[in-house]
């Protein structure tokens, strides 16, 4: 009986891994086609199939796209757009994750009068379409003198991502035993000591989830990038769109 159960368990595990591998191959296939096609010259693309390997490592298309491809009226390549995305994404991700951790810590473990109402308003922000806030955000950026700038994009992404990061951390910290906090308070630990010495060390899983979530959301965003950027602050998503429409 135990041998039969072990065999069924091994079969189910093998089936699970095969299913996951097939799913991964399905989603990675477009990336593979994109990479191998970018390494082919025009004749290879016309004569060979999409999945065939290139005859040689030809990086001319990469150099052209990076240095001198035309994105509208400018022909400076995608490099400026890439660095704009880097300077925009890293601060926005780090600040929104840190701020969300503090919000989640307060709303789950240091509840106060009105904390549930405040969390409900933040939760509403998770489901609000970004198109609804384009005009108000544009007005606020104008008042702050941050229109068409990297700093303005950082602020927009920070505020847009804060409801989600708060939700992640609040739900994660809600599972922390209250006795642990009570014991720390009895030992004289205050708000910041509990957060830095107890909560932060146990937050690695949710921190990684939030960092990945925020990075992908901000790096891949097009709406805010095209609405709030200027000529010198457009992110890579806008640059790629301009490149595709130019060529």
Can you name each region flagged by the protein language model?
Residues 3-6, 12-247:
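A structural signal for multi-pass alpha-helical bundles of membrane permease subunits
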């Amino acid at each position: 009986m135990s041998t039969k159960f072990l065999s069924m368990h091994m079969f189910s595990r093998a089936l699970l891994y095969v299913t996951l591998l097939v799913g991964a191959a399905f989603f990675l296939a477009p990336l593979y086609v994109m990479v191998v096609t970018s390494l082919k010259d025009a004749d290879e693309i016309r004569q060979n199939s999409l999945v065939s390997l290139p005859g040689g490592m030809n990086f001319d298309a990469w150099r052209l796209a990076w240095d001198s491809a035309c994105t509208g009226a400018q022909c400076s390549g995608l490099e400026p757009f890439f660095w704009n995305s880097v300077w925009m994404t890293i601060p926005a991700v780090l600040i929104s994750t840190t701020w969300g951790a503090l919000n989640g810590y307060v709303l789950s473990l240091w509840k106060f009068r009105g904390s549930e109402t405040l969390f409900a308003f933040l939760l509403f922000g998770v489901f609000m379409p970004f198109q609804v806030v384009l005009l108000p955000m544009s007005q606020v950026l104008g008042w702050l003198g941050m229109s068409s700038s990297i700093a303005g994009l950082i602020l927009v992404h920070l505020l847009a991502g804060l409801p989600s990061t708060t939700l992640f951390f609040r739900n994660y910290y809600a599972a922390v035993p209250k006795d642990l906090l009570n014991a720390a308070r009895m030992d004289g630990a205050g708000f910041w000591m509990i957060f830095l010495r107890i909560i932060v060390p146990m937050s690695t899983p949710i921190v990684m989830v939030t960092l990945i979530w925020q990075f992908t959301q901000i790096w891949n965003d097009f709406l805010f990038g095209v609405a709030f950027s200027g000529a010198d602050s457009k992110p890579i998503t806008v640059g790629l769109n301009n490149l595709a429409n130019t060529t």
